[in-house]
A protein has these predicted regions:
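Gram-negative bacterial Sec-dependent N-terminal signal peptides
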Residues: 2-25
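A residue-level marker of the well-folded mature domains of exported/periplasmic proteins
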Residues: 3-6, 26-375
Length: 375
């Protein structure tokens, strides 16, 4: 009898030891899911408070600013240019937009043309600063002030390209984290994710790495593949790639996360052709930027996209002008970084979403006008 009790006790102890890692793993995953839900809720909350600068130099006068867009088909680059143009008008500055047309040679040509116009400042609209470093340094040597939007992997100074005064962006790692965690939450912790990126851009690579970290932090989720497809050639590649991935992964593929909404402009037709339900079918598509007009429409209509982590494009355009104004006045950058914001069908008509853009209701235009001393 004593021996039986000893054996039974040993078996119970062994069972407890075996079960302990399972219990700990479950607790860790519960903690991760709680964190993910809280993060997503905060990212989707209304934006009502201005957290940017409240002091700075008054408007400098008589300036010409050139906005060099990497590709005006990119809704993000186009939107920032629109915001910068509006802010430049408030300043009384001359403003021009040049289109890099989605290729390295065309971007180089547009930058060279911008320098020839002898502006006071150049804004890089999602032009990778490392890619165009020699021409940027030519601009700086000519006395031109240069700021970037999505021109490097993080806000602030860009390593290796000291001539760029500051890089303006929502923190891309937080943008990517929001996209990744939304897939985790929406799936109930069971997302099988395809990641779409463009390694030409350092910021895209940084986003993709952060998306992967967010997804793989969930024990029941996994990344199926990372697909590196140039944004500038999506119209030719994305349709066939989507069809190929559907054939390879079938129903195992439940979520997509792309570094830009533009990917889904071209994935929707093959999904429809494959009989995927636009609202309830899989894969469910999420974008880690930038909040394009078609993306807002897809989310509102529940057609092949469930979320975008939108950039405040017009706000960023105004910030570009503010940072140039600070540089013209001999002052340092503001270091302002706008917080991330997640749009889903639940909040798609808030914070500018009704107009198909993330335009925060925090009074940023009035705040910048007060700093500059203009109406």
């Amino acid at each position: 009898m004593l021996r039986f009790r000893l054996i039974s006790g040993s078996l119970l102890a062994s069972a407890a030891i075996v079960a302990l890692p399972i219990v700990l793993a479950q607790a860790a995953d519960d903690t991760f899911m709680t964190m993910a839900k809280e993060y997503v809720a905060q990212a989707a909350a209304p934006v009502t408070t201005w957290t940017g600068p409240t002091t700075g130099p008054k408007a400098q006068t008589g300036k010409l600013v050139i906005y060099v867009s990497a590709d005006q088909k990119n809704g993000g680059a186009q939107g920032v240019g629109d915001g910068a143009q509006e802010a430049a008008k408030a300043m009384g500055w001359d403003f021009r937009i040049l289109d890099g047309q989605g290729s390295v040679p065309a971007r180089s040509s547009a930058l060279t043309q911008a320098i020839a116009l002898k502006p006071a400042g150049i804004i890089l609209g999602t032009i990778d600063a490392a890619e165009q470093a020699p021409i940027i340094e030519q601009a700086v040597a000519a006395g031109i002030k240069v700021v970037g939007w999505h021109s490097g992997p993080a806000p602030g100074k860009i390593n290796g390209v000291p001539g760029v005064i500051t890089n303006i962006t929502t923190d891309p790692l937080e943008v990517a984290k929001a996209a990744g965690l939304y897939a985790v939450v929406d799936s109930g912790g069971k997302a099988n994710v395809m990641l779409f990126t463009d390694s030409i851009y350092a910021i895209a690579t940084a986003k993709t790495n952060a998306e992967k970290a967010a997804v793989t932090g969930c024990a029941g989720c996994k990344v199926l593949s990372v697909e590196d497809t140039p944004i500038g050639d999506l119209s030719n590649r994305m349709g066939q790639l989507t069809t190929s991935l559907l054939s390879k992964y079938g129903k195992e593929w439940t979520y997509s996360i792309a570094v830009n909404d533009l990917y889904y402009d071209f994935s929707a037709p093959p999904l429809q052709a494959a009989g995927v339900d636009p609202a309830a079918g899989y894969p469910r598509q999420i974008s880690a930027g930038d909040g394009s007009v078609p993306a807002f429409q897809r989310i509102r209509d529940k057609r092949y996209q469930i979320a975008t982590v939108a950039e405040p494009l017009h706000l960023h355009g105004w910030q570009c002008i503010d940072e140039l104004n600070r540089a013209f006045a001999g002052q340092p950058p503001s270091t302002y970084v706008a917080p991330v914001h997640l749009f889903t069908s639940a909040n798609i008509d808030k914070d500018g979403g009704a107009q198909n853009i993330f335009d925060p209701g925090n009074g940023y235009k009035d705040e910048y006008r007060k700093i500059w001393g203009v109406k």
